[in-house]
Amino acid sequence: MNTIYIENIEGLTSEIAKSSKLINMLSSKYKLLIQGYISTGDAHVIVCNTNIKESIINLFMEDIIKDINNIIRGIN
């Protein structure tokens, strides 16, 4: 398993990080399993595990962040 850090997600809260909508989207669309959420002031990070190579996930990181932002806007 590879650990992936999805960083700098504005507006992310622990409630959104734990939401079934976000969990389902990341697991079904990107094969990412959320392992945790880290918030230190301005930094918001989702920690995920995956069997997919990190270099491949990084190619889709912009799309992943856009999808997460769409969920944040939908929840708030």
Model-predicted regions and their roles:
Residues L22, L26-F60:
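Acidic, low-complexity, intrinsically disordered interaction modules
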Residues N2-Y30:
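N-terminal acidic leader/helix
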Residues M1-I4, G74-N76:
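Short, Lys/Arg-enriched, disordered terminal segments
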Residues N2, Q35-Y37, D67:
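Polar/charged side chains located within well-ordered beta-strands of beta-rich proteins
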Residues S19, K53-N76:
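Ampiphathic alpha-helical segments that act as solvent-exposed interaction surfaces
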Residues I4-E7, L12, S39, N51, ...:
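Exposed, low-complexity/repetitive linear segments and helix-based recognition motifs
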